[in-house]
């Protein structure tokens, strides 16, 4: 067993858990504390020295935050010898992508998506206070801490691509964001700010619900095309100012057209670049509103007498889609800020409480958020908003009547305990939560069964009666799953996740917009800074059905290295055993593989550590 030593500590290397393009990650035992840690090991040379310099600078800035309260990974120390660099981090369990893959990419209920979103928004709000743009937010960079002890408690990792806003705003060609989660201002070459992270988070939220990336573009043209087909064309003034607009758009030949720009056709793009556009979406949405109709979300609208639990879940899903729409806007100044998003009814659960407080769904949602924010059984410290953000931006609905300025009661209780009758019983059943409670039957063995389960909504109440469907349905464009189906699984390339050589990122050359003065609104949006635009506020929507598919889609790959030929970067949808759920008991546990908790041992780390190792 090898041993490495810093100036202040000594580490015993237990095993190497992952190797990447620029280094490896090992699980080590820290002698001074007796804790297991993750050690990223890189070669000590001039090239890697330049790469690691930025990450170290950002890690030291973030080190001033409380990593548990700010939901960022704990950085322990950095040291080096003549041959290697060493970065030591706390040991986390697995990232959201690996969690999805373990669970066959089944859709995550809205209440769990809220729990994750709340924590990531808190992290982004803290990073904004330090003027830091994470610039690579995606499921791989959101880590579950310990799913057995703290369900859906997460932390943001990987600051190798992060930037300090004041330093990057005038840089000619910074590298930021992975393609699936890349903001429009980065795609088009427009001024950008920290709201690029908000766009990425909106894409992650949609992906957790869909079980598939919302915009899985094979290249930047496909990425822009997918966004346009769902959200409409960007406003003309954006394209007039965009440095890269001519890559994806052309002038409209019709002088009377409302928009002087039009998206280049697939044939135009093929003729110009010799690259054939691909169709890799699972759902071809004609608007973001259609997100709520996917995976059984539209079942309630087709039932005459849905029960109150189904109504509560449907209302929550609808509220989540409203927040996603505020996050995914073409114009960054119209996009919701992290602090304002923390006041959104979906995150605060205000509407859910007012209309569905007596439901088990609400109580479980509240309990899940509460547990994710507590550390060692203690409530989180108060979050005080800056003057420009208006009122305190974090407050769950249950706190409204008892919370002070910081969102904590005077007695120190984080939530009121005088709960409605039966609530405690519901809380006690948290361990019995299932990721597919409202979507049983997703564990089909065949592709046809999986597609059928996703298309046929669950019968919510046995006494319900179906009524004719209302409203358009999204087009199911990809039949199969990320793990099974007719497409051959391919091995993921080394370092294909988030390499710190920025190989999966892009260049752009723009200045950042000046900060706009706050424009006070009302309700939960009070305090969100906005700017006004002389252009119409409504983004034109594409009409008609989605484009016909000429090529069968390939498995939706994670964004691969941009500096290489895309055809040489295979996808990562690898086969895994059937997924296991935490805490399933009774008859629902029958037929599911056994899960081995680890209350007395180190959590699973392979996925996270391989990712960290692949970063360099």
From Swiss-Prot:
Residues 497-512 have a biased composition (Polar residues). It comes from the Eukaryota. Residues 487-616 are annotated as: Disordered. Residues 542-560 have a biased composition (Basic and acidic residues). Keywords: ATP-binding, Cytoplasm, Kinase, Nucleotide-binding, Phosphoprotein, Serine/threonine-protein kinase, Transferase. GO terms for cellular component: cytoplasm; nucleus. Expressed at moderate levels in lung and white adipose tissues and weakly in brain and liver. Pfam families: Pkinase (PF00069). It catalyses: L-seryl-[protein] + ATP = O-phospho-L-seryl-[protein] + ADP + H(+); L-threonyl-[protein] + ATP = O-phospho-L-threonyl-[protein] + ADP + H(+). PANTHER family: DUAL SPECIFICITY PROTEIN KINASE, HOMEODOMAIN-INTERACTING PROTEIN KINASE 4. Belongs to the protein kinase superfamily. CMGC Ser/Thr protein kinase family. HIPK subfamily. This is Homeodomain-interacting protein kinase 4. It comes from Mus musculus. The gene is Hipk4.
């Amino acid at each position: 067993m090898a041993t490495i030593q810093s100036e202040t500590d000594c580490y015993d290397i237990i095993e190497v858990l992952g190797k990447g393009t620029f280094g490896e990650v090992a699980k080590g035992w820290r002698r001074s504390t007796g804790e297991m840690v993750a050690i990223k090991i890189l070669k000590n040379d001039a090239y890697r020295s330049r790469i690691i310099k930025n990450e170290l600078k950002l890690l030291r800035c973030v080190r001033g935050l409380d990593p548990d309260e700010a939901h960022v990974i704990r950085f322990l120390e950095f040291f080096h010898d003549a041959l290697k660099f060493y970065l030591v981090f706390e040991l986390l369990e697995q990232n959201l992508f690996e969690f999805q893959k373990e669970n066959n990419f089944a859709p995550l209920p809205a209440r769990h998506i809220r729990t994750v979103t709340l924590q990531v928004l808190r992290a982004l709000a803290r990073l904004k206070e330090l003027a830091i743009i994470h610039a690579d937010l995606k499921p791989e960079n959101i880590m579950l801490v310990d799913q057995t002890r703290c369900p859906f408690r997460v932390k943001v990792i990987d600051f190798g691509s992060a930037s300090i806003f004041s330093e990057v705003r005038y840089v000619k060609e910074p590298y930021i964001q992975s393609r699936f989660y890349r903001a429009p201002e980065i795609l088009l070459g427009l001024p950008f700010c920290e709201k690029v992270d908000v766009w990425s988070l909106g894409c992650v939220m949609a992906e957790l619900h869909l079980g598939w990336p919302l915009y899985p573009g094979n290249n930047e043209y496909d990425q822009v095309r997918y966004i346009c087909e769902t959200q409409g064309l960007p406003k003309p003034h954006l394209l007039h100012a965009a440095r890269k607009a001519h890559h994806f758009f052309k002038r409209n030949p019709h002088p009377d057209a409302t928009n002087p720009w039009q998206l280049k056709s697939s044939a135009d793009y093929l003729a110009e670049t010799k690259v054939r556009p691909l169709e890799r979406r699972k759902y071809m949405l004609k608007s973001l509103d259609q997100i709520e109709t996917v995976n059984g979300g539209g079942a309630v609208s087709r039932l005459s007498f849905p029960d109150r639990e189904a109504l509560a879940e449907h209302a929550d899903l609808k509220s989540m889609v409203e927040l996603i729409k505020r996050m995914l806007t073409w114009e960054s100044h119209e996009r919701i800020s992290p602090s304002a998003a923390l006041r959104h009814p979906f995150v605060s659960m205000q509407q859910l409480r007012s209309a569905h407080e007596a439901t088990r769904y609400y109580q479980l949602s509240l309990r899940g958020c509460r547990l994710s924010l507590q550390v060692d059984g203690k409530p989180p410290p108060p979050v005080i908003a800056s003057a420009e953000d208006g009122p305190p931006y974090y407050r769950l609905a249950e706190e409204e009547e008892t919370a002070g300025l910081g969102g904590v009661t005077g007695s120190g209780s984080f939530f009121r305990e005088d709960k409605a009758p039966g609530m405690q019983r519901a809380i006690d059943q948290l361990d019995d939560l299932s990721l597919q409670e409202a979507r049983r039957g997703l564990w089909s063995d065949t592709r046809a069964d999986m597609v059928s389960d996703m298309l046929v909504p669950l019968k919510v109440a046995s006494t319900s009666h179906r009524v004719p469907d209302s409203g358009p349905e999204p087009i199911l464009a990809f039949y199969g799953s990320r793990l099974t189906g007719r497409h051959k699984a391919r091995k993921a390339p080394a370092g294909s996740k988030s390499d710190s050589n920025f190989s999966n990122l892009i260049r752009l050359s723009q200045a950042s917009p000046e900060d706009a003065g706050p424009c006070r609104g009302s309700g939960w949006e009070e305090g969100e800074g906005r700017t006004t635009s002389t252009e119409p506020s409504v983004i034109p929507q594409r009409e008609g059905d989605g484009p016909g598919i000429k090529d069968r889609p390939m498995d939706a790959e994670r964004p691969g290295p941009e500096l290489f030929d895309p055809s040489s970067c295979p996808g990562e949808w690898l086969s895994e055993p059937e997924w296991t759920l935490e805490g399933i008991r009774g008859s629902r546990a029958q037929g599911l593989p056994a899960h081995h908790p680890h209350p007395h041992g180190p959590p699973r780390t392979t996925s996270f550590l391989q990712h960290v190792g692949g970063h360099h």
